[in-house]
UniProtKB/Swiss-Prot annotation:
Induction: Induced by HAP43. Belongs to the PGA37 family. The keyword Glycoprotein applies. It comes from Candida albicans (strain SC5314 / ATCC MYA-2876) (Yeast). Glycans are attached at residue 182. This is Predicted GPI-anchored protein 57. Keywords: Cell membrane, Glycoprotein, GPI-anchor, Lipoprotein, Membrane, Secreted, Signal. Residues 1-18 form the signal peptide. GO terms for cellular component: extracellular region; plasma membrane; side of membrane. Residues 42-60 have a biased composition (Gly residues). Predicted GPI-anchored protein which may have a role during host infection.
Length: 214
């Protein structure tokens, strides 16, 4: 009976020892594999293996490899559309070669100056008749009575007339002087300004006075 108990006890202790040794072997193998995997072959920021089984010393990475290749390589997410500005020149869209860059009388700006044609004319029509050239200067600068500005002065025709009609009648010229300057007079009554022609004003005034006397 005692002998049987000793055999059972010996068998039980042997199983415990075998299981412990097997566990120790497994733990040692896992630790060895982890150490060998973590110190894997990293080539310049390249294939960093993350603890997988390396076959024959090669770079078998079970994890993801870093994309940064040493000394160049392609950078993911690079700009697919390079800037269109060419170094040292390039063609500016819309401009034409030759002395008449804006010969089609296009509207354009350079700095703070804007206008039509080669000489920044105030309108396409002015550019078409040669604004800024020798054939445009003189008395026919604004012969079509166009509205234009020079600095802070704006008006119609050659002499900055207040309206196109006055420019057509010769505003600012000798034939215009004294003709249309004071054709109306203003009378203020009860805060209301009335623009009445001079002759009519005197006739109405005389008629009113005559009716009062009667």
């Amino acid at each position: 009976m005692l002998f049987t108990q000793l055999i059972i006890l010996f068998t039980f202790i042997s199983q415990i020892i075998c299981v412990s040794i097997s566990d120790l072997n497994n733990i040692a193998l896992i630790q060895f594999t982890k150490r060998r995997g973590s110190s894997g072959h990293s080539s310049g920021g390249g294939h960093s293996s993350s603890g997988s089984h390396s076959s024959g010393g090669g770079h078998s990475s079970s994890g993801s490899s870093s994309s940064g290749s040493k000394g160049g390589g392609s950078s993911s997410g690079s700009s697919s559309g390079s800037s269109s500005g060419t170094k040292g020149g390039g063609s500016s869209s819309g401009s034409s070669s030759g002395s008449r860059n804006w010969g089609s009388n296009q509207y354009h700006c350079t700095g703070n100056s804007c206008g039509y044609g080669n000489y920044f004319a105030p309108s396409a029509a002015a550019a078409a008749v040669g604004y800024g050239t020798g054939r445009y200067t003189g008395g026919t600068k604004y012969g079509n009575n166009q509205y234009h500005c020079s600095g802070s002065t704006c008006g119609y025709g050659n002499y900055y007339a207040p309206t196109a009609a006055s420019a057509a009648a010769g505003y600012g010229s000798a034939r215009y002087a004294g003709q249309h300057n004071n054709s109306t007079s203003t009378k203020t009554s009860f805060g209301v300004s009335l623009n009445i022609p001079s002759t009519h004003f005197y006739v109405i005034g005389l008629a009113a006075a005559y009716s009062i006397v009667l």
